[in-house]
């Protein structure tokens, strides 16, 4: 959803990976690669060499992009961050280098994230993101619980059910 949007409005997005502290860290990277290949675009992933297990997402986004922006790399790119907290660090790195990400500019830097973190709509610029469909997730959880209560010998296998997100286009991309 967001990979396709960024490719359409600002060029092939670069994926800024996040620390591997939960299962979706790698899943989002894999989904990005699959979508880029589907679009016939070359995936570019950054930040993998700086990954830690501490979960300092904002510091990670800041450190990785500060290093690239210092060399003049990715200053006119669309950057898709693995989550909104990484994107907050990315926005900070952009500010440190006098860069102004934004959807209202032609070309230039665009930064987006995932999760619709509560502060995303209050950042400057406001952060373009994908919100999780909490209502659908909740309904699926209730349905699964009801199924478990109704069935005498419920199979407790782990299942993964993907839900469509909701694109929140804001000022950053």
Short names for language-model regions:
Residues 1-173:
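Bacterial carbohydrate/catabolite-sensing allosteric modules
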């Amino acid at each position: 959803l967001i990979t396709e949007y960024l490719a359409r409005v600002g060029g092939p997005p670069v994926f800024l990976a996040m620390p591997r502290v939960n299962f979706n860290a790698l899943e989002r990277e894999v989904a990005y690669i699959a979508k880029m290949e589907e679009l016939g675009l070359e995936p570019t992933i950054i930040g993998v060499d700086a990954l830690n297990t501490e979960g300092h997402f904002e510091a990670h986004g800041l450190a990785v992009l500060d290093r690239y922006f210092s060399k003049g790399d990715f200053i006119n790119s669309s950057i898709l961050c693995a989550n909104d907290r990484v994107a907050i660090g990315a926005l900070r790195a952009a500010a440190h280098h006098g860069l102004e990400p934004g959807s209202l500019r032609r070309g230039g830097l665009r930064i987006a994230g995932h999760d619709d973190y509560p502060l995303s709509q209050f950042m400057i610029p406001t952060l373009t993101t994908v919100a999780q469909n909490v209502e659908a997730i909740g309904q699926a959880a209730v349905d699964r619980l009801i199924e478990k209560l109704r069935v005498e010998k419920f199979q407790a296998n782990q299942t993964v059910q993907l839900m469509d997100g909701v694109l929140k286009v804001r000022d950053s991309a």
